[in-house]
Amino acid sequence: MDFKYDVIVIGAGHAGCEAAAAAANLGSKTCLITMDMNKIGQMSCNPAVGGIAKGQIVREIDALGGQMGLVTDETAIQFRILNRSKGPAMWSPRAQCDRAKFIWSWREKLENTPNLHIWQDTVCELLVENGEVVGLVTLWGVTFKAKCIVLTAGTFLNGLMHVGRHQLPGGRMAEPASYQLTESIARHGIAYGRMKTGTPVRIDARSIHFDLMDTQDGECDFHKFSFMNTSTRHLKQLQCWTCYTNEEVHRILREGLPDSPLFNGQIQSIGPRYCPSIETKIVTFPDKEQHQLFLEPEGETTQELYLNGFSSSLPMDIQIAALKKVPAFKDIVIYRPGYAIEYDYFDPTQLKHSLESKIIKNLFFAGQVNGTTGYEEAGGQGLIAGINAHINCHGGEAFTLARDEAYIGVLIDDLVTKGVDEPYRMFTSRAEYRILLRMDDADMRLTERAYHLGLAREDRYQLMKTKKEALEQIVNFAKNYSMKPALINDALEKLGTTPLRQGCKLIEILNRPQITIENIAEHVPAFQRELEKATAADSDRKEEILEAAEILIKYQGYIDRERMIAEKLARLESIKIKGKFDYASIQSLSTEARQKLVKIDPETIAQASRIPGVSPSDINVLLVLSGR
């Protein structure tokens, strides 16, 4: 057996799976090393993919030729679009998945990917020669050689779990931690730190009084994650349930705080701000009388339920006693308690936008080891790292995404430019070009780039082109078709909008909030015929195309304005400054700016402007020095 590869990926979580699939599908001889082949793509916390901004990332992964969207659609047991009451820039898909089927779907895809081999083992050392990674050594004493390595070790690096005052080494419940690897990397000058995350109890459904909870149903419309017309949701669609904590629950939780590792000094690491434990909630918001809980199924047939909103590392008896004070949980039986876990991460400002280390050539980092939290954030990073590892092996320009191209671009730019001091989670508010980064048009933004790269296949590219042509046909018809008051006013009144006083173009009527493409098409036969003609080549995705067309029509002004702003700022992206200045010697820069610029060494003026502590006056100094 030959232990020489183009690309080796360490860790088979969400980042590792995407990285390995991308590198192999692009043609690199790839090896994915995992501690347990039965946990490939494991959903370590909640059994769900997507959510606010995260759903857009999954759509982008799919548009680029990644796998997460396909796996999610195949294993979804409930699907919803979040933020429906807001504009389309905020719409975010989310799916509950069957946890076990999710793992096997990923494994099936990876095992049947050409150029990809899977090896079960634990990596304990990287081999570095002259500042370049050349291989690794495993606990079994196997030496691998590689042109590039992608580290996606998740929470396993020196992982330590906590339940009350009990501590147990591990990367996940009942799974061993990975030792020696952090130290092997750090000795080459790469800085690292510690972070913390947590997960809630898992509950036996047979012990729950569901009649005392509210139900939360999914949506059974055309929406899904993948843009491919072969992707379907075929599993049984299930309910979720909601309920609330109360003062009695909070009283018991407060009594347990002296034994809470978060409050007794046992855990020093920082946890995710936007996914706090239940004990953090009651301390931070002491006046809040209740907190909402979501009970989510772990699979199509299992009795195991996930209690979203009750992450905890309190002693197990406190967790159970508190939950018993919720009426629906009065007879609760759990499979395992909630727990917290501390783990190592590496400072992401030591990375290029390609996710390659600035310190060790051909070593890439992706996922939770970069200080992020979330399957989707990990998957997006893994995809980019896998692509660029392949490019480093075979030559070519690094593949990066700009902030106006993708949420993945925002994510990576934030990491490498600003760094992290707590687990990073993506939100729509982090993106300044939200209307350009909608969930409906990720294929329009990214598939062509992925096609020319070689990752998006011909069938995906043709689907994108067909959709693009249909959108152009519908929008152009609406711009040019004239409407006469006598022919449309009765319909407008029925639809609850003001009648026309004079003729206008159809697009002006479609801009009204009460009007949709489908309800006006019922009254305009020529438009109905045009819609049928435009979507004839892709009738399976007709609803998706009509939704995208309506968004383009109603929000075109906002889209154009945001694109114009992005293009203006793009001029600063074209001014390259990496390696041009000795920042420490430029006295006209502020002290903080000098320190930050030396540390980050930004690629462009635009990136420099996004570094915290670098002021507009500092940017003006750099512009003058650049001859601008």
Curated annotation (Swiss-Prot):
First-listed, main subcellular location of the protein, grouped into a coarse class? cytoplasm
Enumerate the subcellular locations listed in this protein's record, separating them with semicolons: Cytoplasm
Q: Which cofactor does it need?
A: FAD
Q: Does the keyword Cytoplasm apply?
A: yes
Q: Which UniProt keywords apply?
A: Cytoplasm, FAD, Flavoprotein, NAD, tRNA processing
Cite the GO molecular-function annotations of the record.
flavin adenine dinucleotide binding
Report if keyword Hydrolase is assigned: no
Which residues are NAD(+)-binding?
271-285
Annotated binding of FAD, by residue:
G11, A12, G13, H14, A15, G16, V123, S178, Q368
Annotated GO biological processes are:
tRNA methylation; tRNA wobble uridine modification
- InterPro entries listed in its UniProt record: FAD/NAD-bd_sf (IPR036188), GIDA_C_N (IPR049312), MnmG (IPR004416), MnmG-rel (IPR002218), MnmG-rel_CS (IPR020595), MnmG_C (IPR026904), MnmG_C_subdom (IPR047001), MnmG_C_subdom_sf (IPR044920)
**What Gene Ontology terms describe where this protein resides (cellular component)?**
cytosol
- Annotated disulfide bonds: none
Assembly notes:
Homodimer. Heterotetramer of two MnmE and two MnmG subunits.
Kindly give the PANTHER family that the UniProt entry links to this protein. GLUCOSE INHIBITED DIVISION PROTEIN A, PROTEIN MTO1 HOMOLOG, MITOCHONDRIAL
NCBIfam families attached here?
Answer: mnmG_gidA
Q: What does this protein do?
A: NAD-binding protein involved in the addition of a carboxymethylaminomethyl (cmnm) group at the wobble position (U34) of certain tRNAs, forming tRNA-cmnm(5)s(2)U34.
Q: Which family does it belong to?
A: Belongs to the MnmG family.
Q: What is this protein called?
A: tRNA uridine 5-carboxymethylaminomethyl modification enzyme MnmG
Q: Which organism is it from?
A: Bacteroides thetaiotaomicron (strain ATCC 29148 / DSM 2079 / JCM 5827 / CCUG 10774 / NCTC 10582 / VPI-5482 / E50)
